[in-house]
Amino acid sequence: MKLRFWGVRGSFPVPGNLTARYGGNTSCVEVRCADNSHPDAPRLILDAGTGLRRLGKEMMQSEFAEGTGTAHLLVSHTHWDHIQGLPFFAPLYQAGNRFHVYARQRDDTHLRTVFALQSDNPYFPVPFEAAAADLEFTELSDDARFNIGPVQVRCTRLNHPWIAIAFRLDYEGASV
């Protein structure tokens, strides 16, 4: 598997010269199957922090610009620094694209509602309903196990304020 770190900061983005080496965006990691030769090799995205905006710009140079892209977004938890990039994610507004969104089930509200509320007036000028891509939300238990194509995903609860889970990804003998 190949990883690309689009955002590694916590709590809030910190742009500037002091963060140039590792970047100033919040949590977003792209995981690709090593050679993408498997016909079902998925594009995986871990968390939707501000790094998601830059990833989205790059994705719009591929099939996502034509509305034929598919990706899987695994969200560890819905604190602001892990979801604040979603309203700025260009592929989300391209009809035909498909996004499967996975996160820990919450007791207080549905996952789709959490994402919609951050784009609600007066917080953001574009409502979540303007997203033209096809979105599928899957709410997970702490110990969920499932496959995304040839990638096995295992979840475990984290010791973190509120509700958070970690994802272990296994593909052809490699693990992340």
Where are these regions (language model features)?
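Binuclear metal-dependent hydrolase catalytic cores
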Residues: M1-V176
